[in-house]
């Protein structure tokens, strides 16, 4: 897809068929369908009183929310009295190419379980629930109005083939549809396979992804002066987010923001 041919219309979003807008007849029949087959909470399975909320009230309350005290730079949860003007303890002494990273949940407990089911359990349908959580957070924070393009962190083609989908792509698509934003699914390419970041130390994570991403040639002019939202499932050390942002800034992006469903807690203040 070239920048000139990309569209902000949801119909242009390369999402799975169930993410597209359904025909009028199906929409008309939807109340009867929901009455016969009520939706269930994605976390505990109980029938939902309010459709399209994905979580029952109890599970929604029990999710490990980052809360109002978060680092304004990397998005990690911090104490209520933490000094974060220059970042938190986990990020203030690091160079980060992105302007800000945000996440509604901590990567623990039920959030970790759902994300692992999503990408490793191949539960692509969870993109709707997790994308809705992230979308609610972006809407409340106002960040959805601060970007021009939405781009997923790309997977290497071998990993995408084995998994069947790129979880970041599905989340990015949910956000593009909800906020009517321009989706750039092929803005970045992963140039080489990398080790799974989970078992690596912070320093090794940075080395692992350094040089792993590139801006695709058709976007070299389309990204100039744009504010880009990079989307992924989990923010751990920020190595992947930093490398993606570094490539985009080098390509002329005005600003890069990062949005993930969950954040691994690292800061002590």
Features from the language model and the residues they span:
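Glycine-rich phosphate/pyrophosphate-handling loop used in enzymes and phosphotransfer proteins
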Residues: 1-269
């Amino acid at each position: 897809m070239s920048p000139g041919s990309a569209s902000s219309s949801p119909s242009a979003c390369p999402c799975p068929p169930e993410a597209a807008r359904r025909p009028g007849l199906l929409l008309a029949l939807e109340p009867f369908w929901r009455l016969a087959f009520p939706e269930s909470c994605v976390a505990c399975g109980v029938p939902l009183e309010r459709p399209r909320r994905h979580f029952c009230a109890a599970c929604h309350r029990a999710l490990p929310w980052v809360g109002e005290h978060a680092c304004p730079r990397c998005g990690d949860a911090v104490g209520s009295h933490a000094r974060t003007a220059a970042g938190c303890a986990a990020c203030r002494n690091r160079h980060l190419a992105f302007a800000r990273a945000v996440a509604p949940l901590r990567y623990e407990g039920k959030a970790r379980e759902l994300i692992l089911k999503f990408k490793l359990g191949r539960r692509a349908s969870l993109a709707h629930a997790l994308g809705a959580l992230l979308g609610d957070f972006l809407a409340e924070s106002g960040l959805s109005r601060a970007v021009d393009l939405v781009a997923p962190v790309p997977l290497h083609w071998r990993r995408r083939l084995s998994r069947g989908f790129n979880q970041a792509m599905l989340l990015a698509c949910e956000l593009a549809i909800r906020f009517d934003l321009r989706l750039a699914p092929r803005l970045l390419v992963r140039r080489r396979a990398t080790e799974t970041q989970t078992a690596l130390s912070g320093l090794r994570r940075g080395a692992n992804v350094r040089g792993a991403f590139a801006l695709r040639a058709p976007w070299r002019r389309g990204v100039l002066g744009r504010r880009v939202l990079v989307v992924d499932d989990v923010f751990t050390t920020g190595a992947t987010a930093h490398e993606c942002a570094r490539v985009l800034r080098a390509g002329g992006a005005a600003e890069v923001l990062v949005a993930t469903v969950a954040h691994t807690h690292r800061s002590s203040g």
